[in-house]
């Protein structure tokens, strides 16, 4: 299993404890506050409707239309707030479907090296003359480990971000009801979808690594191969860092 195999997991499968915390906080702490905000926005929407009715001369047909539209908006927005978790789960499922589809074409991958650096160092003949080579290999080995740690951290941070979104989401969704602030909810949903889709992009990018490593060949000295492997790993690291930018560009393009 590679580093990207965990990206196919659901939020509950990846860490059921954190998923439970997010659900509990959303239901027990954030939801009551969100419903209170929603009630305030409902009052403001009703006030705005009365202002529009007054400006239109209190026409009966227009009055009925405005009140009906406001009531429909209130019902829909309350449903959205109460079912925030289901909405986010649906968005996450869309992203997961993309990731699973990608996994059918790109296998799992991880930051490793076909150059066995530790054994290469151990196999070097003794003597001062080989110390520079050993030091080079040690430096490359440590840098590869750092790349590996950073990639793992970014993968984990993506899940942590989703748990935080799930815990606090209903506050943003509550703004859907109020015309002046509904963009907050829309932008929040775009951001959530971007983070969810980042899993698919990360799976794809990390899955590319074995192909990059395989393109190095076996020519050259052991140090040349090691530095070439490090270069490919750095390319992977840059792509992993840019994964969030890729998905935000996709979701921001949505109307």
Predicted regions and their residues:
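Hydrophobic transmembrane alpha-helix segments characteristic of membrane transport
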Residues: 40-71, 168-182
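Membrane-interface junctions
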Residues: 24-32, 36, 70, 145, ...
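Membrane-interface helix-boundary signature
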Residues: 27-34, 64-68, 133, 140, ...
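Binding/recognition "hotspot" determinant
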Residues: 1-37
């Amino acid at each position: 299993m590679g580093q990207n195999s965990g990206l196919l997991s659901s939020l509950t499968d990846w860490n059921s404890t954190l998923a439970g915390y997010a659900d509990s906080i959303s239901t027990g702490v954030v939801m009551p506050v969100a419903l209170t905000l929603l009630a305030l926005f409902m009052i403001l929407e009703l006030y705005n409707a009365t202002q529009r009715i007054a400006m239109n001369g209190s026409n009966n047909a227009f009055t009925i239309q405005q009140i009906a539209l406001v009531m429909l908006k209130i019902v829909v927005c309350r449903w959205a707030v109460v079912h925030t978790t289901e909405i986010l789960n649906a968005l996450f499922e869309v992203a997961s479907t993309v990731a699973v589809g990608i996994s059918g074409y790109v296998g799992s991958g991880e930051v490793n090296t076909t150059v066995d650096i530790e054994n290469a160092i151990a196999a070097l003949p003794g003597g001062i003359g080989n110390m520079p080579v050993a030091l080079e290999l040690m430096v490359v080995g440590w840098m590869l480990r750092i790349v590996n740690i950073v990639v793992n951290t970014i993968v984990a941070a993506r899940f942590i971000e989703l748990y935080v979104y799930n815990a606090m989401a209903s506050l943003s969704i509550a703004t859907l009801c109020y015309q002046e602030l509904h963009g907050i909810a829309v932008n929040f949903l775009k951001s959530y979808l971007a983070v969810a889709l980042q899993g698919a992009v990360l799976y794809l990018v990390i899955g590319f690594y074995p192909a990059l490593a395989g393109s190095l060949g076996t020519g050259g000295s052991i140090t040349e191969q090691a530095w070439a492997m490090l270069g490919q790993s750095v390319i992977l690291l840059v792509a992993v860092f840019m994964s969030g930018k890729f998905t935000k560009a996709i979701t921001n393009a949505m109307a």
